[in-house]
Amino acid sequence: MKKITVLVDLYYLKAAVAGIGSYIREFEASCNDHGSNDFKYVFTHDINKLVGNSIFLNSNNKIIRWIFQIRYLIYKQIQLPLKILFSKADYVICPDYIAPYFTFKAKRITVLHDSLFWDHKKNYSFLWNKYFISLINLGMNKGTQIITTSNYSKKNLIKILGSDKSISSVYQSFNFLKTSSSNYKTPENYLLHIGSFEKRKDLITLVKAFKLVDDPNLKLVLAGAQIIN
């Protein structure tokens, strides 16, 4: 029986520090560790050459960031379609919001992690936000399967994209059996927030709200990567 070929796009790992970067790394590892024998997973890049080895990673240089966006556009609309064609992929998975316009016979599975680009436009420049949303829409057709990371995001995306879109929520997993020796001394009772330290996350409001909690034994722990923007 012929295996179903699934092409997984790893390109965005060149620039992703936290959220999407973690998602891509864990997805790639899961495909290798838990993939079905009925599927053949093909990766667009060698992940070991991408992780922590890019000038685009968390750069505060606007020129470098724009160079990445130009290369990203060329890759998505020209190079990735060629990879789809030559790999004879049945499915292509894009974990970074954007799928190419041409996927030939391959069905598209696109991960929209949330609806922030539509809900919080003030966090992005007008032109960039309009451009990015246009790219998202360009990569979607009637057969696109959209994956998001929570039911909350699913409801928001249905309101934005329409109920005719196929949207499924798949929560990100956690290995409760895996333990590690940590040097971090966490309190006995605490609330944990995991996410990058970005202005748009509005962590200041979270800290102010926690300050109102009348429980001296409860602590707030923030964990995540520092992002330049």
What are these regions (language model features)?
Residues 1-229:
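Carbohydrate transferase catalytic cores enriched for Leloir-type hexosyltransferases
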